[in-house]
């Protein structure tokens, strides 16, 4: 098959457990770009959290695409936005007041800055460092927020995450969803946002048949993308539901699973 796009989840997929891209994975993906295959970084992260990886992969040189916020915002590597979908501000405020009752740390961003009620909250420093963004603190997010966010990020004790997710799911209006994006993260965003729709939209923009795409992922939020792609590939370290939704599995993110699969498919 003539593959023209490789869509890549970041954490637990493209990067290893140290948040690094291995030299073999880097070399293989740049080799794919030199063959004319476009890379798509498909992440729950805000766009600034993708910039370092974009630069390592030389994506600007080869026309790569950034899919941030699980597909809530799609841009080219120069920062030009193809589209963006955000939450309603009044609804967001109601949700924030509800979340005050739950054991979660809420992190909101506008693409440039994180907004929290406690800079020392669970995973706040980790998230700021990982995305290379600054953080500002205030007393009450529900009253303080003045913009419509694309998503709400919730850091949760992994032992409580399924229980908390169910409580939130029962509260949310029909047009919003809550998804696990890591063992300790939940994200709330518009239901029409998902990586699968994002991949389809990118293919439409680039005039590429989505069947000519490969996608790699490991988490629940990757499932729509793995189903939408011509070939969806789950990492060995993926959740079982992700593996069931994929066409095939590969080695883990610590074992160069991406190069292994691309060579098995004769892409490289």
Task: Describe each model-derived feature in a short phrase.
Residues 1-5, 22, 187-268:
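Mg2+-dependent phosphoryl-transfer enzymes with acidic/Ser/Thr/Gly-rich catalytic loops
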Residues 2-18:
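Asp-based phosphoryl-transfer active-site loop
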Residues 23-123:
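Active-site phosphate-binding/coordination module
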Residues 25, 50-54, 164, 168, ...:
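Hydrophobic packing residues within well-ordered alpha-helices of enzyme cores
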Residues 36-40, 62-64, 151, 211-212, ...:
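Short active-site oxyanion
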Residues 46, 70, 111-112, 184, ...:
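A generic "binding-loop/recognition-motif" signal
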Residues 57, 62, 70, 171-174, ...:
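Short, structured coil segments at secondary-structure junctions
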Residues 98, 102-216, 237:
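Conserved acidic, metal-coordinating active-site core of Asp-based
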């Amino acid at each position: 098959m003539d593959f023209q796009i490789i869509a890549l989840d970041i954490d637990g997929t493209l990067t290893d457990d140290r948040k690094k891209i291995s030299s073999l994975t880097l070399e293989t993906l740049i080799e794919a770009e030199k063959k004319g295959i476009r890379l798509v970084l498909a992440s729950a992260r805000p766009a600034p959290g993708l910039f370092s990886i974009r630069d390592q992969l030389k994506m600007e040189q080869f026309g790569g695409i950034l899919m941030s916020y699980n597909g809530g915002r799609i841009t080219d590597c120069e920062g030009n936005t193809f589209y963006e979908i955000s939450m309603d501000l009044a609804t967001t405020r109601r949700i924030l007041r509800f979340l005050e009752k739950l054991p979660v740390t809420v992190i909101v961003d506008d693409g440039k800055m994180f907004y929290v009620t406690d800079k020392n909250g669970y995973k706040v420093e980790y998230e700021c460092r990982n995305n290379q963004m600054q953080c500002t603190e205030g007393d009450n997010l529900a009253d303080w927020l003045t913009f419509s966010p694309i998503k709400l990020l919730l850091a949760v004790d992994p032992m409580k995450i399924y229980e908390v997710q169910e409580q939130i799911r029962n509260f949310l209006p029909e047009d919003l969803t809550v998804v696990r994006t890591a063992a300790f993260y939940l994200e709330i965003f518009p239901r029409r946002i998902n990586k699968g729709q994002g991949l389809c939209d990118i293919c439409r923009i680039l005039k590429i048949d989505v069947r000519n795409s490969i996608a790699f992922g490991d988490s629940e939020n990757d499932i729509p993308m793995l189903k939408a792609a011509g070939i969806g590939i789950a990492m060995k370290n993926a959740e079982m539901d992700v593996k069931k939704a994929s066409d095939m599995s590969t080695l883990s993110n610590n074992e160069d699973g991406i190069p292994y699969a691309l060579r098995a498919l004769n892409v490289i």
